[in-house]
Amino acid sequence: MALNDWLDWGDWKGIRGEEMAAFCASLIWWIAALVVLSQCIRMVSSRQTGPILNDKGATIVKEQKRNMFLRLPIILTAVAVLGLCAVVRVADVGHQFGRQLSSYTATTTTSSNDAQFTVAMDSDVGADLIPNIFDPEAVDPQSVCPGYTASNVQETSHGFTADLDLAGKACNVYGNEIEALKLVVEYQAADRLHVEILPRHIGKDNYTWFILPEGLIPKPQNDGKTQSAGSESDLEFKWANAPTFGFNVTRKSTGDVLFTTVGTKLVFEDQFFEFASPLPKNYNLYGLGEVIHGFRLNRNLTRTIYAADIGDPIDGNIYGSHPIYLDTRYYKADSDSDELIYVAEPTDKTASYKSFTHGVFMRNAHGQEILLRESNITWRALGGTIDLYFYAGPTADSVITSYQKSAVGLPAMQQYWTLGFHQCRWGYTSWDSLQEVIDDFAKFEIPLETIWADIDYMNQYRDFENDKNSWTYEDGEKFLDKLHKNGQHFVPIVDSAIYSPNPDKKDDAYPTYDRGLSSDAFVLNPDGSLYVGAVWPGYTVFPDWVGAVLGKSKTFAWWKTELETWFKKVAFDGIWIDMSEVASFCVGSCGSKNLTQNPAHVPFQLPGEPGNEDYSYPEGFEKTNATEAASISALSSSAEAAKSTAVNDAETTSTTTSYLRTTPTPGVRNVNHPPYVIDHIHGDLAVHAVSPNATHHGGSEEYDFHNLFGHQILNATYHALLSVFPGKRPFIIGRSTFAGSGKWAGHWGGDNYSLWAYMFFSIPQALSFSIFGFPMFGVDTCGFAGNADMELCARWMQLSAFFPFYRNHNAIAGIPQEPYRWSAVADASKKAMAIRYALLPYMYTAFYRAHTLGDTVMKALVWEFADEPWLADADRQFLLGPAVLVTPCLVQGATTVDGVFPGVGKGTVWYDWYNQSAITGVTSGQNVTIDAPLGHIPVYLRGGYVIPTQEPGKTMEQSRANRGALGCA
């Protein structure tokens, strides 16, 4: 808590625990100091400095000495108190503003205190690789590969097929060239065109090198309504050998070429393919995730699609794989011919524009790289087929709807209670600590729907087992019974790796592992032995979801059994799936020969452990909290100096790097180090992940299915929960996702940071996941890593109140950030929550439309107001449903915010939520400065809509019992 907050008497109601102890220490210090000072003054003033003039002089001297000796214990005691309080204050520099590191770090030791061995720190170090796009020695496939020529065209009922044959000598630049390909073109629906290029000859041994099995990812099918090839479609496919094979996809209504490979060469090898298309000047592309980035994609970037366990780097590949983009183009009608003409710079806000949006989806699960440059797009992948789906639109909403209905499935419908507020942190140490948080929410009258538990609850970080001391099943039953009677809910985390017990320790038995082993439920090494990596519990094995579909593994049945068995002990209400990229903290099967060392400590310091404290704070903290910032800076500098010394001691004198480069071998794939190196955030594909050569039951390799682990664990969890909760909709939040995961689960944005920049990035991330088919999306409000401060947390709690999934969560090394920790945050939260809870019937309706129609819940302004090109990159505002406009303050220290009121030039009227007044005097595209003092978030209602509301309560159960109303704007 900041010093100025301590002086705010209104904030005293939020002080608890160590915060009060810190304050009391300060108070006692000053009292003790005054005692010492007063006693010293009395001693000095009572001493006789002149000669003794009477016969009682000896008695007076004795009395003075006696008084001095009487005061001496008082002084010494006061000095001791001074020292003790000083120690408390020094040890608690951060406690002025709520730091509680010691209490949360304790969970690290309670869960890992049996560790005998630490996995080597260098065990997660891979080969030195340089991404192809940065490699000066890299070969450009377009300059050396021959391309293909098309022949043997065969008409089909909805399109045609053709043979593609290599047009010259194989280049074998990043794999072994496939000489004979097949082209399949199919008009699947009036708004959807399918283009697939695959090898003509595929055997059982290399089937999964190229074919993505429909048992894992369903393939969009012909809708049965299209009568003849292309006659009803606004899309047209044409091809030519000019001189090598290329194709065009054109929009008939505008004559615009949406995608063309003509003039470039198709490259197709067993570990690499490439095709390219020009893009119009100043193009507007969206999607291609998962990545932390602005909503509209820059015109000079590379998008890598490869699931990675990493803490939200900007512009790096992270957890999910979503190879789809939207392309929006703006046109003006020619005054003479009414012909639509593309406009590269639609800046005239008085002009009338018409937009068209199309979508492109690549059904491919391999590692991919999409190069966006100033005037073209190049698509590369490490395997699979070119399996493209073009969506005609012509609006973003219609593309998203068609994509969901045809390719990935309609989003999961959520239970009503899931729309309430969720509280979590890594560092809640017991059932009692959860109850304390719940009680504090009630004390400060802040709504709380769901309390979550991170890995703290686990017995030595093992799935489906509770800690035997602080999280007993008996105490949990009492806690959950009370929680559920109060209409509240509980969601625990479940990680994706399974502890492998120490064979030399009889007391290390783990029934979950034993049942999985008997079900052939775990991923293997190429030699058939168990693949053993390392995650939180130590050395671990990994569920084989692919083997359950393509082999004889009983992984799904085993997973169902584990959830059902655990539910009988812990009556959870939903499941949080984490680490599902899938993460492993060592390269390769590092635990195969080390199981007798289990349970082992991970090869790095856990957050909050000595030497790994977190002293980071939001941008601007040093201005608004100068005293605390200075103390933190000193501690941080000391810690960094220690780290720097350790690093310098370990450094070698080498100043050059020798990169590993591999070349293709005929008939053999190098899956661990493919010849083409994608720009992967971890470099080596085996770093922080299961190695690409890990083998699934049935013989397929992880290389071909890495991006699907998170998708399939959500599939398994969803269907298991249908059994756990008969007749109820499963509630699941997952980290790693793939195209289609949204039909089973929601998603949170992962391990973000307590920074203003990340609060902003949460908006484009949410809008991107609307494209991907995930209406249930939110982020770690107030930030996961680092330390939030009052202003950031207040603004973020306001912003997230209008996200579909609303949860506050942070890491074990950070200060507590529950909204009641600061009075200003509590007030801002309650005000924003009151609006959210009032709008819950409206939000629930939006979810129903998403689930049944493929609509979006959180919307970009440009989707609703498609013909206003100045909204093309608007990502600091958004719409909740079609009728609620949110304009959050995203800048530290600001008390106003700039925003636009879309549609005002065409008759749209906006009304202030707070006073119901209409916004007037605003022109189309005008940036308006809006008052946004701390505690206020501007919210507006769109005219012409009827909005269902209800009186807000502290829980969904209370809210639904309150009276409802209809608001007409």
PLM features: what roles do these ranges have?
Residues 1-8, 97, 101, 109-110, ...:
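Extracellular/lumenal N-termini and interhelical loops of multi-pass eukaryotic membrane proteins
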Residues 129-164, 177-230:
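A low-complexity, Ser/Thr/Gly/Pro-enriched, surface-exposed linker/loop concept
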Residues 16-28, 70-77, 708, 792:
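Transmembrane alpha-helices of multi-pass eukaryotic membrane proteins
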Residues 1-16, 21-27, 31-67:
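Short, low-complexity, Lys/Arg-enriched N-terminal segments of secretory-pathway carbohydrate enzymes
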Residues 941-969:
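C-terminal low-complexity, glycine/proline- and small-hydrophobic-enriched intrinsically disordered tails
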Residues 230-268:
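Hydrophobic or amphipathic alpha-helical targeting/insertion segments
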Residues 117-159, 255-937, 941-942, 950, ...:
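Catalytic-domain carbohydrate-binding cleft regions of carbohydrate-active enzymes
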Residues 2, 38-42, 80-137, 142:
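N-terminal signal peptide
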